[in-house]
Amino acid sequence: MTHQYLIEIGLEDMPAHVVTPSLQQFHDKTVAFLKENHLDHGAIDQYATPRRLALLIHDLADKQADVEEDVKGPAKKIAQDADGNWTKAAIGFSRGQGMTPDDIVFKTIKGVDYVYLHKAIKGKTAAAILPGMLDVIKSLTFPTRMKWGAYDFEYIRPIHWLVSLLDDAIVPMKLLDVDAGRTTQGHRFLGRPVTLGNAADYVAALKAQFVIVEPAARKQLISDQIHQIAADHQWQIDLDADLLEEVNNLVEWPTAFAGNFDEKYLKIPEAVLITSMKDNQRYFYARDASGKMVNAFIGVRNGNADHLANVIAGNEKVLTARLEDAAFFYAEDQKRSIADDVDRLKAVSFHDKISSMYDKMARTRVIADLLADRFGLSATDKADLDRAASIYKFDLVTSMVGEFPELQGIMGEHYAQLAGEKPAVAQAIAEHYEPISADGALPESLVGTVLAIADKFDSLMSFFAVDLIPSGSNDPYALRRQAYGIVRMIAKHDWPFAVAELQTTIADALKAAGKTNNLDFAAHQQDLNAFMIDRAKQVLQGQKIRHDIVDAVTVRADADLAGILDAAKILSAHADDTDFKPVMEALGRVLRITKKQQVKVDVDTAKFENPSEGQLYDATVATAKKFDDEPTEADYQALKALADPINAYFDATMVMADDQAIRQNRLAALLQLAALIKQFGDVSQVIVK
């Protein structure tokens, strides 16, 4: 016989972003609880609204399976005295297992007799186990928690009711002053309390009280309603998945509606309209058949269609107030020039330990100019980059960005276009924030990419200079994300970026330009270098590069980021080659024997004592002439060709000869070869089978 078990947590309204992950956590911890308690079960239905998290477990076993087991105790010589009487050890062992010494049997293991008890453990019933679900409820974690009443207990929101039904029977449990029962709550305004006769009644009973508990069904209903309204008005709707998920977790009985706003507000930049509707009001914006935005929106209320006209009017009033403010800010911002706003950045702090935003922009301009030369930008791109770097933060002091912080960069691009800046300059202003997340879109333009790198690297150097370095999970200034973004941009364009050398060069350039702001850029250069290489590791791991190859290519503290990425890709591309193992073994042998060796002599070919020495040295010299500054496929093939000469060399040559002059000469020759191999890192760490 199997059962259905319903467990529901009834709460005050949860934040929308918490609902879905909390339901998944509730499910996963329940599955773990059932597994730990050896209760078999079938499918588990997951239900959630802003006011509840619930699970319905199907085909739940009536009880645990009965188990028989033999429990090993002490050796016989310890369990019985010389007269065969049971000792305290035997009596205590049997009592601990709920049995008596009369139940003891002996088994011989490797010539030694041991005490054993054969136990038949009767499985507990589901009804006896399920009260333990209270611990699952209490174990749920949330990004924010609160207390209520006089209790010290913390949860995402106060718990008002619990339902715990095994078929038609209540499974008792109590949390604070809330006893689990069979009564759940309908819609806050449209429904009534519902007394469930059976766990299986849950979905239908709540639907009758204006609550759709299935998230997928509720989301589909919202989608269908929106599409119907759009079809009725011949609109195109961007049914944004994140917004749909958020709205779905804000309602229990959704009813979509269309609203309008004055056409005059369409003169406001589209990004502002979208932000006002989508981010601030959770509306879906509308476009006509040609893709042009129209003065309308679709919202979703938590209720039925009663008095919908009043709901629409209220929503229109709220949106109009927002758009009126936006229109005012937009007009006011255009009364000032970009130069005016740039000057106002002198009063805006980037960080109180570092500088103003104006000074940060000046440092970034120096860094961007230096990077432009290294990356080979054209004269036109350099000019556009310099202009963009001199103004790119100006929109931070605009009223529009003050009201809508998420539009920084976007409004900068728009205002730059209005002011007659070149398209490349305006685009770079918007793109310098990218990527805005670990896997976010990268800047499309070269100018925007270099500005983004320069801005982020200035932030990294500046924060490290004042010892504000991320530790553990603490990263309040998102420096890991910025460094990760730099590595991704470098990887996309395969630009040289030797972090250790670059820090010194930038510090010197800033000093020469008088733009250091008294920051000690030398204080944590090695820390920043290691920090950037760690981000390169993350990028490679995200590309599914083998961990041993990642470790091998990132071993050099002075390595160029692009070189690290290229080396990893090349080694990974050849990892399944039949000759990869002998090549890595040969190259790794050179690195191992030269490790920690420091030789300050020139190679003297006259001291070579066998043909293999000359052959390997000549091949090394010839290879070095063709080697690129950073690893290439041709470089790998050249090193691969040296595998046989290396093996022949070690077969015929004792590197650590007793004669110091011979030893030093051989090490000097091998160190030249090792320097070439190290372009690919420490390949001796590559695991080959």
Swiss-Prot record:
It is an enzyme of class 6 (ligase). It is found in: Cytoplasm. Keywords: Aminoacyl-tRNA synthetase, ATP-binding, Cytoplasm, Ligase, Nucleotide-binding, Protein biosynthesis. Its main location: cytoplasm. Belongs to the class-II aminoacyl-tRNA synthetase family. GO terms for cellular component: cytosol. One of its GO terms (molecular function) is ATP binding. InterPro entries: Gly-tRNA-synth_bsu (IPR015944), Gly-tRNA-synth_heterodimer (IPR006194). It catalyses: tRNA(Gly) + glycine + ATP = glycyl-tRNA(Gly) + AMP + diphosphate. It comes from Lacticaseibacillus casei (strain BL23) (Lactobacillus casei). Its EC number is 6.1.1.14. NCBIfam families: glyS. This is Glycine--tRNA ligase beta subunit. GO terms for biological process: glycyl-tRNA aminoacylation. Tetramer of two alpha and two beta subunits. HAMAP family: Gly_tRNA_synth_beta (MF_00255).
